[in-house]
Amino acid sequence: MASSTVSVVLSLFLLLLTQANSANIQSFSFKNFNSPSFILQGDATVSSGKLQLTKVKENGIPTPSSLGRAFYSSPIQIYDKSTGAVASWATSFTVKISAPSKASFADGIAFALVPVGSEPRRNGGYLGVFDSDVYNNSAQTVAVEFDTFSNSGWDPSMKHIGIDVNSIKSIATVSWDLANGENAEILITYNAATSLLVASLVHPSRRTSYILSERVDITNELPEYVSVGFSATTGLSEGYIETHDVLSWSFASKLPDDSTAEPLDLASYLVRNVL
């Protein structure tokens, strides 16, 4: 998968949205971040045009026990209770995770859809997104995690990408070899026609790519309106720390006029033609 694939596919998605009925489209794109566009929680800040999710000392060294979240300031409607229509959506972002030690990392970053007004959850291995490794529908949260530390209670025994539904215990995972201090280009899509959530990650410097997918019925797992954004945490001790910077971010969704309208089939297109 070429390093430009993420941006090319998102551009295609935006074009499809534009050519479709312009109603019910929600989209935004940031190459430089500014605070008024975001709800910042915990240690998250906007610094030099990037989202810096976890705390960093003046010397550039990350701090332990840091938690930061950043969500787009406007709610996103992902389905319509009155019509039964469900939105297809895609998001693309570039992140960089850097750790002082090449041997120890913690804990990771997640892209999350959470209830509007949600507050940070537990620190450390819970990534600030969940409180438990037991499924709890009242959490009303779906996330894709990029987990740099294996917690023995619920994680596989390696760094991994995971899809989380109302629990920090992932319903699907794939092993991931983090490129320390290098950019990762990430694309996540949701296909309303198939309920398929697809996540892909590329390290352009290594020409390595990872892909993960799982079916998720978001009408059963999420509220009608959500906040979309990021959450990240560092480990609880000095030996397990890392930075979490979001360098760019785009998001687009299309909610059909009714439940019978044909949704965008982007996820299937990716699997067949790109990934």
Curated annotation (Swiss-Prot):
Keyword Heme in record: no
Pfam families: Lectin_legB (PF00139)
Site note Cleavage, residues: D265, L266
UniProt GO MF annotations: D-mannose binding
Keyword set includes DNA repair: no
Modification after translation (UniProt): Subunit II may arise from subunit I by proteolytic cleavage at the C-terminal end.
Gene3D superfamilies: 2.60.120.200
Membrane-traversing stretches: none
InterPro entries in UniProt: ConA-like_dom_sf, L-lectin, Lectin_LegA_CS, Lectin_legB_Mn/Ca_BS, Legume_lectin_dom, Leguminous_Lectin
Entry-listed glycosylation sites: N136
Top-level taxonomic group: Eukaryota
Residues making up the signal peptide according to the UniProt record: 1-22
Keywords: Calcium, Glycoprotein, Lectin, Mannose-binding, Signal
Family under the similarity heading: Belongs to the leguminous lectin family.
Function, as annotated: Metalloglycoprotein, containing Ca, Mg, Mn, and Zn and the carbohydrates galactose, glucosamine, mannose, and fucose. It agglutinates erythrocytes of blood group A1. Has a high preference for GalNAc over Gal.
Known partners and oligomeric status: Homotetramer.
Protein name per its UniProtKB record: Seed lectin subunit I
Organism: Vigna unguiculata subsp. cylindrica (Horse gram)
